[in-house]
Amino acid sequence: MAGLGASLHVWGWLMLGSCLLARAQLDSDGTITIEEQIVLVLKAKVQCELNITAQLQEGEGNCFPEWDGLICWPRGTVGKISAVPCPPYIYDFNHKGVAFRHCNPNGTWDFMHSLNKTWANYSDCLRFLQPDISIGKQEFFERLYVMYTVGYSISFGSLAVAILIIGYFRRLHCTRNYIHMHLFVSFMLRATSIFVKDRVVHAHIGVKELESLIMQDDPQNSIEATSVDKSQYIGCKIAVVMFIYFLATNYYWILVEGLYLHNLIFVAFFSDTKYLWGFILIGWGFPAAFVAAWAVARATLADARCWELSAGDIKWIYQAPILAAIGLNFILFLNTVRVLATKIWETNAVGHDTRKQYRKLAKSTLVLVLVFGVHYIVFVCLPHSFTGLGWEIRMHCELFFNSFQGFFVSIIYCYCNGEVQAEVKKMWSRWNLSVDWKRTPPCGSRRCGSVLTTVTHSTSSQSQVAASTRMVLISGKAAKIASRQPDSHITLPGYVWSNSEQDCLPHSFHEETKEDSGRQGDDILMEKPSRPMESNPDTEGCQGETEDVL
């Protein structure tokens, strides 16, 4: 098993290293800023001017080569259409298409007097204007939008209910559940920030805006023009910053959950209360530091639009810490699975059912995948492509797990938690008992005996005690013994003794002699210490730290 653990560690580090290396070579969103786009256009313009000078020296032609602001057009032939591939330096262009120009018989390019510029056909380059492509892409993104909107909404609702449940029961107040609640809040804030960002941020540069920026005679002026009126982007910049911050906090609270579970397994005498504030600092404080650094760098070096588009290497200020959290969580996951496999191997050595143990390992591993966010490392390792069926499948899977992860986490940490279920059952039993007691008539009425009958329908244990009580009341001596039996409510979990219950005992108990009543009083005094004392809620309700997950 030592060799198995070592191989798991080596395999994990190799996989993590290759994934992070592949991630470092690719842009997370595959987009560029306006400034980066303009720089590429300026470089193409300089190269085109050099080519034009060389072509003019070769001799006269029919239509002169020229730069139109987007494409460097070569020398044209009289009366024919010139076709040039769509330039690869324009991000939004269809790089597999071509642009067209027509050379007139008089040796000049077609000119549109209404627009005061040379005519050119870029319809094949503008891929999002093609009906067959735009309709399919629009439907695809609409499906994604509906899917992750439903997912984040379900996650938000389930997490809100889980927080109310854990916060309501004092017996569930402990460090482990406090960490769970912080994780729930981070998922809810992540969902909220996504909804807000979708409403206030424009995701793409429009065609008209692109043309207005790069179709100028001097594109360098457009860089300065983009910085003239920035007040209109303040709201969406704040939305983007908050989205990145809550996204980072969500990743780091998942890391905190992994660290906490790992310490419970591997650290002897682990004091969870002592490290709670440290976990809070990791989950909320550390992401605030590098997100603030990114915001300052973006405002200083690339203050364009809403900051929703990538700005070169500035993005690594917040992406590198997030990738580090994902990688560290993956290592903790491998180490935890290694311990589980070791325990199962040792259990099999003493003759347990092998298939049952491996099913238990598979179940625990599946739960740990969601708890540690292992699916993030899978999506990081996948190659980034923005076309084809593989990309569409990847987008569906990634957005599905990202949006529904909060729902899965709430099920694991709250709704399937044995302690939470026990507390809910206790509250339900108390509520049923209170309803039954309110429906019974006063004890002084003729139907006072029905009180005992009503209570017997609440729990099966009470029905047995009531039946035996009726039998022993017939004989005088047996009635004294029955009166000394502990009250059936004491057997209910979480039951709290109430003095009002003595007022609803059947009349037959009060018809005993003074001697018997004195003995009964002594017996009751002796029985009271046997009732379960209410223990500290901070410790009693939070036992078994690892059983809920493993």
From Swiss-Prot:
SUPFAM superfamilies according to UniProt: Family A G protein-coupled receptor-like, Hormone receptor domain
The protein's name in its UniProt record: Parathyroid hormone 2 receptor
Primary localization class, coarse: membrane
Cellular component annotations (GO), alphabetically ordered: plasma membrane
Keywords on record: Cell membrane, G-protein coupled receptor, Glycoprotein, Membrane, Receptor, Signal, Transducer, Transmembrane, Transmembrane helix
Underlying gene: PTH2R
Positions on the Cytoplasmic side per record topology: 170-176, 261-275, 338-364, 418-550
Glycosylation sites: 51, 106, 116, 121
Signal sequence annotation: 1-24
Top-rank lineage group of the source organism: Eukaryota
Protein function: This is a specific receptor for parathyroid hormone. The activity of this receptor is mediated by G proteins which activate adenylyl cyclase. PTH2R may be responsible for PTH effects in a number of physiological systems. It may play a significant role in pancreatic function. PTH2R presence in neurons indicates that it may function as a neurotransmitter receptor.
Topology of the protein relative to the lipid bilayer: Multi-pass membrane protein
Family named by the database record: Belongs to the G-protein coupled receptor 2 family.
Bias-annotated ranges (Basic and acidic residues): 511-531
Cellular localisation: Cell membrane
Residues in the Extracellular compartment per record: 27-145, 197-237, 298-316, 384-394
Any Pfam family the entry gives: 7tm_2
